[in-house]
Amino acid sequence: MKTKALFLDRDGVINIDKKYVYKIEDFEFCDGIFELCRYFLARNYLLFIATNQSGIARGYYKESDFFKLCDYMLKEFAKQDIKIDKIYHCPHLEGCECRKPKAGMLLKAKDEFDLDMKNSIFIGDNLSDMQAGLNADIGTLILVNEEKKEGDFFRQFKNLKEILNFFKEKDI
């Protein structure tokens, strides 16, 4: 039987987006991220992070810096009894298959974990996240952004707590 997944963008969903975050001291978790993840873990979703990290290609930081921050982030999730199944990242600039809005990272997860994409969820903070989710045939696309964005193929919320309340009300 295929497994459901919750895909999360990193900057703007897991942590406050401060542009090219790669240092632990600059990494600040968004309010509600742990509660949201625990909710979906309790419903047998696998948890994945799919993040564009063009700061690597731009020379702002090294891939080793990204991995150090990932280790810190995963340890913080573990302290909250949350297991992130895998982090997918694109270190490139435009033009590659893995960079969102293309679906490369999401499709790689689908193949590696035999995921049921139609019953999976992707939460992102940019339209490129929503487009990537659409391109990967993910069933539920959620945009978390205080600025209203145009699009009819996703739902939009102002914050993670609103998203969690939405799913609790739907009893998903």
Swiss-Prot record:
UniProt-recorded name of the protein: D-glycero-alpha-D-manno-heptose-1,7-bisphosphate 7-phosphatase
Residues annotated as binding substrate: D9, R10, D11, D17, K18, K19, Y20, T51, N52, Q53, S54, R99, K100
InterPro entries: HAD-like_sf, HAD-SF_hydro_IIIA, HAD_sf, Heptose_bisP_phosphatase, Histidinol-phos, PNK3P
Taxonomic source organism: Campylobacter jejuni subsp. jejuni serotype O:2 (strain ATCC 700819 / NCTC 11168)
Positions annotated as active site in the UniProt record: D9 (nucleophile), D11 (proton donor)
E.C. no: 3.1.3.83
Cofactor(s) needed: Mg(2+); Zn(2+)
Compartmental location: Cytoplasm
Residues binding Zn(2+), per UniProt: C90, H92, C96, C98
Family: Belongs to the GmhB family.
Gene Ontology molecular functions: D-glycero-beta-D-manno-heptose 1,7-bisphosphate 7-phosphatase activity; magnesium ion binding; zinc ion binding
Name of the gene this protein is made from: gmhB
Pathway field: Nucleotide-sugar biosynthesis; GDP-D-glycero-alpha-D-manno-heptose biosynthesis; GDP-D-glycero-alpha-D-manno-heptose from D-glycero-alpha-D-manno-heptose 7-phosphate: step 2/3; Capsule biogenesis; capsule polysaccharide biosynthesis; Nucleotide-sugar biosynthesis; ADP-L-glycero-beta-D-manno-heptose biosynthesis; ADP-L-glycero-beta-D-manno-heptose from D-glycero-beta-D-manno-heptose 7-phosphate: step 2/4; Bacterial outer membrane biogenesis; LOS core biosynthesis
Site residues by UniProt (Stabilizes the phosphoryl group): T51, K100
Pfam families: PNK3P (PF08645)
Keyword Membrane: no
Recorded superkingdom: Bacteria
Catalytic function, reaction form: D-glycero-alpha-D-manno-heptose 1,7-bisphosphate + H2O = D-glycero-alpha-D-manno-heptose 1-phosphate + phosphate
